[in-house]
Amino acid sequence: MRRSGILMHISSLPNDYGIGKLGKEAYAFVDFLEKAHQKCWQILPISPTSYGDSPYQSFSVHAGNPYFIDLEALEKEGYLKPAEYKDIEWGDDKGSVDYGKIYEVIFKVLRTAHKRFRKKPEKAYSKFVVENKDWIYDYALFMSLKFANKGKAWYEWDEPLKMYKPKAIKSARKEYANDIDFWCFVQYKYFQQWKKLKAYANEKGIEIIGDIPIYVAYDSVEVWSTPQYFSLDKEKKPVEVAGCPPDAFTADGQLWGNPLYNWEYIARDKFRWWVERIKAASNTYDVVRIDHFRGFESYYCIPYGAKNAKKGKWRKGPDMRLFKEVRKQLGDVKIIAEDLGFLTKHVVKMLNASGYPGMKVLEFGFDSDNTNGYLPHNFKTTNSICYTGTHDNETILGWIKSCDEKTRSYCKDYLGVTKDEFVPWAMVRLCWSSVCDTAIAQMQDILCLDDKARMNTPSTVGANWKWRLESFDKLDD
């Protein structure tokens, strides 16, 4: 069945509290999607953001972002008083997230709620913690220690804690018991609210498309507590890190800095770490997009400490062995393979063997001639997701205004429009009319916004992940 949807992260929802929440605005957005006959809401990773604010560099692959917790719901439950969160400065620009300001105040507010919660815990709380024991205890301890160490990365902690020594861990669990309970409470409330929102969306016939990065952050609870799954030395330093080689767009390549996986160990363990991760994601979302899918066939390794990605090398990944195990243990999980970037015949073979739909990004279609594989008349399968652009792209209006005259002219001729301002909606129509089973447009392209609304510019920090929809007024049109 053909369907379409909108790409907009939770952080971009409007409200008065600095960043999008799982509250009434999220439900209103679901109502908008239903009214607009959309069937999908695609979001970015929902994990807690760390330094740089990227949802793709998180302290945990399992935890939800505390920033998204609906404070009004906590008030209704009796855990907050209005003045305790409404009289706080959350940022002075409704169109942009001030992550620094939110970090300053959100945990004080949530700790206030936790104090009241502890006086009369909900019965479902203990059940939630037990059901998530495989990750939540270590995550709660990790966050407790991080705050106790004034935000320092785990590899800068005292040696016994850094090395996850059993005696030190046991002592820390006792010392930080109250803090651990707080971080468990935060996750309990997050997932309680998330499940209600997802159920509401599903009732309206809308699927949530989630996103998981292929790699995890070095400063994460997973690398700290389960180093055996990663390519680390005896001091828990990465041997090599992830990235991409130089190409026509980046002379130095891309140095992501994430530790790489110890695929030999993971394979011996029947890929349990990855199977559990995909299982958790499939329980959280209806469909799971896996970022940098080609990295499972072969991945680029850069020596730890290198200043750029020039001296890296390719190594073979687990390929279909992983996804055969996923299918064996989990059945047919709905997965989207982010297959953008440097693709070889081996990557294409893996994608075809998996049966997962890949991605077609229209913005990539106009930089050569009419044989470009991202132009709809060259699409060879319906088993793909067509996008106007992704979170890493310029908005369509920003792109058409910045590209060279030859590309601009070719694009307008292809779309049959005469002005730059007409291109975004023409591109949306092109996306919708492709043969792909699913078509997704960025909200910024639906609203014909320029690059001031761009979500992310890869390999840069500072101005990313900030864009917000100021209100739903424009959607009424």
Which residues make up each language-model segment?
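N-terminal regions that are enriched for targeting/export leaders
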Residues: 1-11, 27
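Alpha-amylase-like alpha-glycosidases and glucanotransferases acting on alpha-linked glucans and related
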Residues: 9, 15, 53-191, 216-440, ...
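Catalytic domains of carbohydrate-active enzymes, especially glycoside hydrolases
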Residues: 24-49, 284-285, 431-433
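Surface-exposed amphipathic alpha-helices with a cationic face
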Residues: 34, 194-202, 327, 351-352
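Outer-envelope exported proteins of Gram-negative bacteria
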Residues: 44, 207-209, 213, 287, ...
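Conserved, well-ordered alpha-helix/loop/beta-strand core segments that scaffold catalytic motifs
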Residues: 183-216
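Glycan-recognition and catalytic regions of carbohydrate-active enzymes
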Residues: 448-451
